[in-house]
Amino acid sequence: MTTIDLNCDLGESFGAYKMGNDDEILPFVSSINVACGFHAGDPSVMRQTVEKAMQHNVAIGAHPGFPDLIGFGRRNMNVSANEVYDYVLYQIGALDAFVKAAGGKMQHVKPHGALYNMAATNPEIADAIAKAIHHMNPSLLLYGLANSEAFIQAAEKYNITLVQEAFADRTYKQDGTLTSRTEENALIKNEDEAIKQVLQMVKEGYVNTVNGKKVAVHAQTICLHGDGEKAVQFAEKIYRTFKLNNISICAPK
């Protein structure tokens, strides 16, 4: 039986501002990435998200991003490798404290937004992220863009297990990277098209790019976004589609 992880970015509310559909999406995913206060989230939201994840027996990961609340961590920043190391270590350490306080164990780290995209093509940034994980806890998994040489090499250097990630509702460029969110065709808004893409990646090992080319993808985890208008319905639809196609959903081991 084919096995795949379904992950989702949660814990993105901040103070009085609610974001996402955390409670409704949790039943349909096997792992979550919790915002750690830099691009979204706050201490109370972090604690509450961890507790809810444990109630659903969902694997917990840290989702560190750039310190950019207004831009939601989706804007590139001109920072040094040392700054990236500090940002990541600080954030994953904070989430780990909440997980331990709740009696749980953190499973992975997945960079957020611009930090993720920059790391996928910038070896220095990917190296800084992997180094922070190694110093924090080398048994933590690193979720990174499938086929990214920067992520692959950084994980190998620090002896960290890389979980290669693909995206359900994002389009891909010819080089295998994600189409920038600044482009009109960055998101797949048709649910059936998104599910078709996911099944191609999981069952057949490739994705169709915006240029009409096929790119090989070894997807071990699929990211769902939890903040769209139909995010919950989409998550449930993918969950049920996997079940119908005899695809087992579980967190990486």
Curated annotation (Swiss-Prot):
Enzyme Commission number: 3.5.2.9
An example molecular function term from Gene Ontology annotations: ATP binding
InterPro entries according to UniProt: Glyco_hydro/deAcase_b/a-brl, LamB/YcsF/PxpA-like
Top-rank taxon, per record: Bacteria
Family according to the record: Belongs to the LamB/PxpA family.
Function comment: Catalyzes the cleavage of 5-oxoproline to form L-glutamate coupled to the hydrolysis of ATP to ADP and inorganic phosphate.
Pfam family, one: LamB_YcsF
GO BP terms in the entry: carbohydrate metabolic process
CDD domains: LamB_YcsF_like
Swiss-Prot/TrEMBL keywords: ATP-binding, Hydrolase, Nucleotide-binding
Catalytic activity: 5-oxo-L-proline + ATP + 2 H2O = L-glutamate + ADP + phosphate + H(+)
Source organism (scientific name): Bacillus cereus (strain 03BB102)
Subunit structure: Forms a complex composed of PxpA, PxpB and PxpC.
Name the record gives this protein: 5-oxoprolinase subunit A
Encoding gene per record: pxpA
